[in-house]
Amino acid sequence: MEELGSLAVWLGAAWLSLVFALIVLPSALGVSLGISEAYMWVLVKTLEWATIRIEKGVKKPQPQMLKIPAANGIIERDETPMEKEIAGLHRMEFRFSDIFYFCRKGFEAIVEDEVTQRFSSEELVSWNLLTRTNVNFHYVSLRLTVVWVIGVIVRYCFLLPLRFTLAAIGITSMIVGTTVVGQLPNGSLKNYLSEVVHLTCSRILVRALSGTIHYHNKENKPQKGGICVANHTSPIDAIILTNDGCYAMVGQVHGGLMGVIQRATVKACPHVWFERSEIKDRHLVTKRLREHVADKNKLPILIFPEGTCINNTSVMMFKKGSFEIGGTIYPVAIKYDPQFGDAFWNSSKYNIVSYLLRIMTSWAIVCHVWYMPPMVRKEGEDAVQFANRVRSAIARQGGLTELPWDGGLKRAKVKDSFKEEQQKNYSKMLVRNGSQGNLPAGTESD
């Protein structure tokens, strides 16, 4: 029995020694031994082979009855505006048949609206050999099945223990390091050590995700005293960005593991955590942000203006609060490659631990980060217009769909004002067309 215990201790020590020597230490120093690159090369070749096998295995492709206009689309929509579509049926006056237009739009929204589908995982064009994404894919060949089984063994018996070890090291180092640094008096030494801890631990955590991050246009990286705004897909967005530079973060208070990390990191760095439902918290956040931006020696602030996680196919409405405090805005676009793993956090379905387990049993996290030129509020431009301009720039750069809807619809009911807006538009159309119809022949309305 003692021999088994000694063997287990020896194996554990050997395992940790290899992890520290080959992964943790190089990550902390910001160097790579080429292990991640070799793994990604093998993974890409395997998925390419699997895609070819799947395409060959489809003997009789099913006829496509409907054109799919966008990702995750299952119905064909007519995007003609209300006024043009109804005017094409008749002119000027109300007709009972107009009801059918609104009924059709209602049925389309029930079957597939453009908002709620952004809160579920993106559908893949080709299967990536993960069980959780094989809804639309079926048995093709024995060879492909064998490769899938080998993949399951590799992911759960080798990658999961390795990633769990790295995550435990990274999170523990983050909590302990920031707690210790937080005891130091405010000053340049504390700020320097805080940046070292955040940067080092973020690099280890990226390795725990088998992360391959491509940073573009580094000359546009956020500067001190500025505000960095980015589209939001997952809590790991912050790790992805901190892997290349440190930020003072602003975000919602969380419980559980996330809460422990938040309470530890705020001791060493001026992060701002708040409760969105508390009005006094929001006023306090605005005040803190103004003070932070006024000091050009402080770290740039990292804000996700959508306020919730979106599935990385679109960018939804930016809250205007981040754009009211002044200062220079540094937009950042983040785009994940779903072929290697789904980075989206469906917080209404999975807690943070379940989400991390799904991430750690995926193949890898691959994403592109684009630093964009700084933007400032134009003269005569209000906060909402400025927010929309920044959102449009991020959507274009990341190849994402731009949606005007509030991400808060993920949990809240649709406001009555949205329904009333459709009624107002229809009423205005009837009044305008009716006025035009009452004009004498040969005249035009203004």
Curated annotation (Swiss-Prot):
Gene: GPAT3
Domain of life: Eukaryota
Topology of the protein relative to the lipid bilayer: Multi-pass membrane protein
Region described as Disordered: 418-446
A single GO molecular function term of this UniProt record: 1-acylglycerol-3-phosphate O-acyltransferase activity
Record EC number: 2.3.1.15, 2.3.1.51
Pfam families in the cross-refs: Acyltransferase
Location relative to the cell: Endoplasmic reticulum membrane
Comment field on protein domains: The HXXXXD motif is essential for acyltransferase activity and may constitute the binding site for the phosphate moiety of the glycerol-3-phosphate.
GO cellular component: endoplasmic reticulum; endoplasmic reticulum membrane
Gene Ontology BP term (one): triglyceride biosynthetic process
Function, as annotated: Converts glycerol-3-phosphate to 1-acyl-sn-glycerol-3-phosphate (lysophosphatidic acid or LPA) by incorporating an acyl moiety at the sn-1 position of the glycerol backbone. Also converts LPA into 1,2-diacyl-sn-glycerol-3-phosphate (phosphatidic acid or PA) by incorporating an acyl moiety at the sn-2 position of the glycerol backbone. Protects cells against lipotoxicity.
Principal location listed in the UniProt entry: endoplasmic reticulum
Catalysed reaction equations from the record: sn-glycerol 3-phosphate + an acyl-CoA = a 1-acyl-sn-glycero-3-phosphate + CoA; a 1-acyl-sn-glycero-3-phosphate + an acyl-CoA = a 1,2-diacyl-sn-glycero-3-phosphate + CoA; dodecanoyl-CoA + sn-glycerol 3-phosphate = 1-dodecanoyl-sn-glycerol 3-phosphate + CoA; sn-glycerol 3-phosphate + hexadecanoyl-CoA = 1-hexadecanoyl-sn-glycero-3-phosphate + CoA
Motif HXXXXD motif, residue range(s) on this chain: 232-237
SMART domains in the cross-refs: PlsC
The name this protein goes by in its record: Glycerol-3-phosphate acyltransferase 3
Pathway as given in its UniProt record: Glycerolipid metabolism; triacylglycerol biosynthesis; Phospholipid metabolism; CDP-diacylglycerol biosynthesis; CDP-diacylglycerol from sn-glycerol 3-phosphate: step 1/3
SUPFAM superfamilies: Glycerol-3-phosphate (1)-acyltransferase
Regions that span the bilayer: 25-45, 142-162, 164-184, 352-372
Leader sequence segment: none
InterPro entries: LPCAT1-like (IPR045252), Plipid/glycerol_acylTrfase (IPR002123)
Matches recorded under CDD domains: LPLAT_LPCAT1-like
Disulfide bonds: none
Entry's family note: Belongs to the 1-acyl-sn-glycerol-3-phosphate acyltransferase family.
Keywords annotated in UniProt: Acyltransferase, Endoplasmic reticulum, Lipid biosynthesis, Lipid metabolism, Membrane, Phospholipid biosynthesis, Phospholipid metabolism, Transferase, Transmembrane, Transmembrane helix
